[in-house]
UniProtKB/Swiss-Prot annotation:
This is Lactate utilization protein A. The gene is lutA. GO terms for biological process: lactate metabolic process. GO terms for cellular component: cytosol. Pfam families: CCG (PF02754). Coiled coil: none annotated. Signal peptide: none annotated. It comes from Bacillus cereus (strain G9842). Is involved in L-lactate degradation and allows cells to grow with lactate as the sole carbon source. It comes from the Bacteria.
Length: 239
């Protein structure tokens, strides 16, 4: 099975270990990984900021880059969601809407692909400690991926998963929201950190690097001792 990896901007620039872990997990599960070097941003920041025409140019480039893939997998619920929004963005342009739908139909978030396509619930990972899961907004509310991360983590040897209080609440990142609405964003992430600390977890695990960078940065500034990990890193653990 050939998987074309969309690595995302944040992974490429800040969290390269997440990209490496994603590839290694999928390869162990029998996937052949392709990485198109022509890939760029999915266009979400520009689109959400109202720069629709600029965003469309990035989206067209991504459609051209990925439309011949067998499966498209990304370690980001938010970016996967954006791919699924492409047909809506191009709804008034039948030619591009058709090509966008072709891409959207074969785009999966990392854990969604493992559970729903590969039909795997145990990847053989092991990690000792207590964890809690942050469920990112786009991934759960728009993409509809709610259970796959928990299913996979429940089978990680040595890991106990505790429910995160107020799990439905946003962490305050929201891409450009955290820049435009900084005071509100700071209050939201403080509330999220309080919820994490309430669980007594050793690890905070999530599937979107934006959320994890936001929460992790606040945890570090507050001097809390919780390790923040992307779920790909956890599923690649052998400890």
């Amino acid at each position: 099975m050939k998987v074309t990896l969309f690595v995302t901007c944040l992974v490429d620039m800040f969290e390269t270990n997440v990209g490496k872990a994603t590839v290694e997990v999928l390869e162990r599960l029998g996937c052949e990984i392709e990485f198109p070097e022509a890939q760029v941003c999915c266009g979400q920041p520009a689109y959400n900021s109202g720069h629709v025409e600029a965003a469309k140019e990035a989206m067209k480039h991504m459609i051209e880059t990925f439309e011949d893939a067998e499966y498209i997998v990304t370690p980001s619920g938010s970016c996967a969601t954006m791919f699924h929004e492409y047909p809506h963005v191009f709804k008034d342009d039948p030619k591009w809407a058709k090509r966008a739908q072709k891409v959207a139909d074969k785009t999966y978030e990392f854990t969604q692909f493992i559970v729903d396509v590969l039909k795997v619930t145990d990847v053989g990972a092991s990690l000792s400690g207590i964890a809690t899961i942050h469920k990112s907004c786009h991934m759960t509310r728009m993409l509809g991926v709610k259970e796959a991360p928990g299913i996979l983590l429940s089978n990680v040897k040595g890991l106990t998963v505790r429910d995160l209080p107020n799990v439905q609440n946003c962490c305050g990142f929201g891409g450009t929201f955290s820049v435009k609405m900084t005071p509100i964003s700071e209050q939201m992430v403080d509330e999220k950190v309080d919820s994490v600390m309430e669980t007594g977890a050793d690890y905070l695990i999530g599937a979107d690097c934006g959320c994890l960078l936001n929460i992790g940065g606040r945890i570090e500034r507050l001097g809390k001792e919780v390790k923040v990990m992307h779920i790909a890193e956890v599923l690649n653990s052998r400890s």
